[in-house]
Amino acid sequence: FPSFAASPLETHFAADPNQKMDAWYGEQIAKYTTDPAFNTQLTRSLPASDTVPTPAKAMGDVSGAPNMLPRLKTIHDYFRSLAASSPRVKVFSIGTSEEGREMIAAAIADEALLADLENNRQRLAQLADPRLIGLDDSRAQELITQSVPVYYITGAIHSTETGNPSSLMELA
């Protein structure tokens, strides 16, 4: 199959020349990737931050590194450290598992949306069920203009799916 790295899409993902990059992080990902075709500009140009931690700071290496499987506490601590270091991350406790382990969700957005999450949720609920707005198209358009779509990405549903939590740490 053709490599994404060699595709025309690659040019659309150029790094911001003003953004400091984490060269070590990109090198580690390249080292652990089984085929260079899987690496793209996105994995070669990872932004660096003096305040927001990377998964490597939580685990000692990049997500997906050989022989590295993060424990639940490490994963939760990482997401909470993101929330503590960035106004664009908020962590919620959403209950406990059958075995009594805490389950969390992380919302990642701009500060304004995080401050307005509940109102945004209510607007989206109205759009999801047009009966709530009396099937009023003009009200629907107003809600669309005021609302921000939410993308829900989940992982770690099954204990044998060990890569998902690491992937979510990386994605965050």
What residue spans do the PLM features occupy?
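Hydrophobic h-region of N-terminal signal peptides that target proteins for export
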Residues: 1-5
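Structured catalytic-domain cores with a bias toward divalent-metal coordination
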Residues: 6-172
